[in-house]
A protein has these predicted regions:
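Phosphate-group recognition and catalysis centered on beta-loop-alpha active-site segments
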Residues: 1-143
Length: 143
């Protein structure tokens, strides 16, 4: 199962650390985990991480080198969504809004499944504020 840390959270939401580049580095390298980040790009050169607003300045080099540390992705995987039930990512994953179910196995990612007790069996992966809950022997697993 693909396990994705939502904004760098590991054991619950922590707004003081969300989208913080140093914290994200610790998650990607230390835990070998993918991280979903909120990226703002202005004039194709200025880049920032942050949820409700641009907060942490980064550059393309930071973004590019981190993708090499992600255990699954070998290129950027990006998407945009608001409250749509499903969004297709650039790498063909189905990004499922919290509470949206799928019934056949697919390349779908359950977002925040803990909010609605989503049945995870048909999903390829999850994006959560609680990735530690899904680790068994340091491997992502459905518990």
């Amino acid at each position: 199962m693909l396990l994705i840390s939502h904004r760098g959270n590991v054991s619950g939401s922590d707004p003081s650390l969300e989208n913080n580049p140093d914290h994200i580095d610790r998650i990607i390298v230390g835990m070998e985990m993918n991280v979903e980040i909120d990226l703002y790009v202005f004039d194709q050169q200025e880049m920032y991480l942050g949820h409700d607003q641009p907060q942490y300045g980064i550059d393309f080099k930071w973004l590019y080198t981190r993708r090499n540390n992600c255990p699954v992705n070998d290129h950027f995987n990006y998407f945009w969504h608001q409250i749509d039930n499903f969004t297709l990512t650039s790498k063909g994953y189905i990004w499922a809004y919290p509470g949206c179910e799928i019934h056949l196995p697919s390349r779908a990612i359950a977002v925040m499944p803990e909010e609605s007790k989503t049945n995870l069996r048909p999903f390829y992966g999850i994006c959560t504020d609680y990735p530690e809950r899904y680790l068994v022997n340091d491997k992502a697993s459905i518990i």
